Regions:
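Alpha/beta-hydrolase
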Residues: 1-60, 67
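Catalytic active-site module of serine/aspartate enzymes centered on a nucleophile-bearing elbow/loop
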Residues: 94-133
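Non-transmembrane alpha-helical segments in soluble domains
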Residues: 9-13, 89, 120
């Protein structure tokens, strides 16, 4: 028998996951099934991918962002090169760029507390933020 859509999603997720934080196929399958149960729209996914590929350069739009911005990127992301995150930071005035060695294109459970700390700090900075500076 051929691969099911869930089997294929597990395979793709594992391919782009974090080399330093491997996840079992069973765990990834559980996550994929939860998404599937939330009625993930596959046509919407493909529209999003097409829009991202055909979108114009965003540099000028990024320069308009004045809020404190947190960019988290995996140093081992095989889907979106880390240089894309570095480039984004250059164009967002109040951006903080944080990378994680060994992280791919996912959010490893082992790093969730660090993510939450960074996000909480960014929110706190935003509460007292003066966009005129």
């Amino acid at each position: 028998a051929g691969m099911t859509p869930i089997d294929n999603s597990v395979r793709v997720r594992q391919m782009f996951g974090s080399p330093e934080y491997p996840e079992t196929d069973d765990y990834v399958r559980e996550q994929v099934k939860k998404e599937h149960d939330r009625a993930r729209n596959i046509k919407g996914y493909f529209r999003q991918m097409a829009a991202a590929r055909s979108a114009p350069n965003r540099k000028n739009m990024l320069k308009k962002i004045v809020a404190p911005t947190l960019i988290i990127h995996g140093e081992d992301d095989q889907l979106v090169n880390v240089n894309g995150g570095k480039e984004t930071k250059k164009h967002v005035r109040h951006a903080k760029f944080v990378t994680f060695k060994g992280m791919g294109h996912n959010m490893p459970r082992e790093l969730l507390k660090k993510f939450l700390t960074l996000i909480s700090q960014n929110i706190a900075e935003g509460e007292n933020f003066d966009s005129t500076k």
